[in-house]
Amino acid sequence: MKLIEKVFYTNAKLPEQFLDICLPDCDSFPVYVYLHGGGLTRKDPIAERTEPRKISGFTEYLVNHGVAVVLVEYRCYPDACYPEFILDAAYAVAWVKEHMSEYGNVTGLFVGGASAGGYLTQMLCFDKKYLGKHGIDPDSITGYIMDAGQPTTHFNVLKERGIDSRRVIVDEAAPLYHVCAGRDYPPMQIIVAENDMRNRFEQTQLLISTLKHLGTDESKIDYRFMPGYKHCEYGKYADENGDNILGKVYYDFISKF
């Protein structure tokens, strides 16, 4: 494995706008652009690293199975406001699409994330304007992984507006608002835990139901229900063979395309 750290994906080179590239030991590979979770918030500024990033969990599993993983940092509250984190996510995807061929033969481009990263992924997929600003049709992405993302307006976006963050609102800041008929959506993996955070399971079911109601090819929806787990908890555990559970779920989807 080869690790390339702190590559800035905008000309502004703001402290939060960088990515780390984890390359497998092969010349051809699919690429998974991963957007981390955390409620779109960051308590402390990103500190300068004194040691290389530790690669473990799903990232290690994917790289060991021939998938390049790009780990994206982006602006968060309290130093950002809507929609800056979505704009950053789009910039990162555009950088990867333009530059990853410099590192090997790219066989597919997947975009995904967990929790807040799942929300960002949904916004990139369903609201065409964000990737469109970079000349990218979101339907040209090989596949999307929406891991426990909120398809309604994100609770911290509501908080920014001074609205009770428990409310369920679907407006232009909600991925669901942009789901429509007539698009040939790429394959998407949608993941939710049995004991996920309040309302996340129900909102996920509404997203899936809406996609189907609007005529989305159901064979492109890879729904994964994670029994017994809490919100994104499955990323921390290994199976009986010692393999990261989330890594296997991601790889099962990526390897199909």
Q: PLM ranges: what are they?
A:
Residues 1-27:
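N-terminal cap/lid segment of alpha/beta-hydrolase-fold proteins
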Residues 49-54, 58, 68-108, 239-240:
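Catalytic nucleophile-loop/oxyanion-hole region of alpha/beta-hydrolase
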Residues 135-143, 148-161, 166-205, 209:
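The feature captures the conserved acid-bearing segment of alpha/beta-hydrolase catalytic domains
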Residues 91-159, 171:
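Primarily recognizes the serine-hydrolase "nucleophile elbow" in alpha/beta-hydrolase
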Residues 32-37, 71, 95, 190:
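Structural cue for short, hydrophobic secondary-structure segments
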Residues 205, 213-257:
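C-terminal catalytic histidine-bearing segment of alpha/beta-hydrolase fold enzymes
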Residues 116, 194-197, 228-230:
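Acidic beta-to-alpha connecting loop that harbors the catalytic carboxylate
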Residues 25-61:
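Short, surface-exposed "cap/lid" segments of acyl-processing enzymes
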